[in-house]
Amino acid sequence: KWWDFGRKQGGLFVFNPTVTVDNSWWYRGTADAMYQNINFLKKRHEPYVIITSGDCIYKLDYNKVLDYHIEKKADITVVCKDMAPGEDVSRYGVVRMNEDSKIVEFEEKPMVSKSNTVSTGIYIVRRRQLIEMLERSADEGRWDFVTDILIRYKNMKRIYGYKMKEYWSNIASVDSYYQ
């Protein structure tokens, strides 16, 4: 009940990697983590899925992002954050958007970047399209959500960036965790 926020339907679901007799693979990447839980997605009726990272701390109203996603008629919305000028963005996915906020370039952990706008690892995706992209990716043995879905489909799908102004911090390293 707590994780569903007292709802009868929907809510928050956390998926942990599970090795079983039927499934001997640990998650091979971010797309595989979703693919291994695809039956859950197929049984749901909600039109949208919010995907979040487990190594970030942030304050964000998902309803505002969902409204933006619907307004843009987006296939995928990437929540982005402008980092301070001069801040090292080489450990993030870096995005460039056009004047309509459509993502025109996505570089994963670039050595030199043309932008200081980073992906926060938070996405809203149409559920049916997510299932379709995950199945295609798995059929081809591709397991990374950013490389094999976002970057691959950026010119074929309507992928928009939503710039968050609220607090966001990545805690993927011990140092960043203690900060």
Language-model regions, residue ranges each:
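Conserved hydrophobic/aromatic beta-strand scaffold that supports enzyme active sites
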Residues: 78, 94, 122-124
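Conserved beta-strand termini and adjacent loop/short-helix elements that scaffold enzyme active sites
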Residues: 15-17, 79, 162-164
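Rossmann-like NAD(P)H-binding beta-loop-alpha module
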Residues: 36, 81-111
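Conserved N-terminal catalytic core of the sugar/cofactor nucleotidyltransferase
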Residues: 1-68, 97
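Catalytic-core segments of class I nucleotidyltransferases/pyrophosphorylases
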Residues: 42, 46, 50, 57, ...
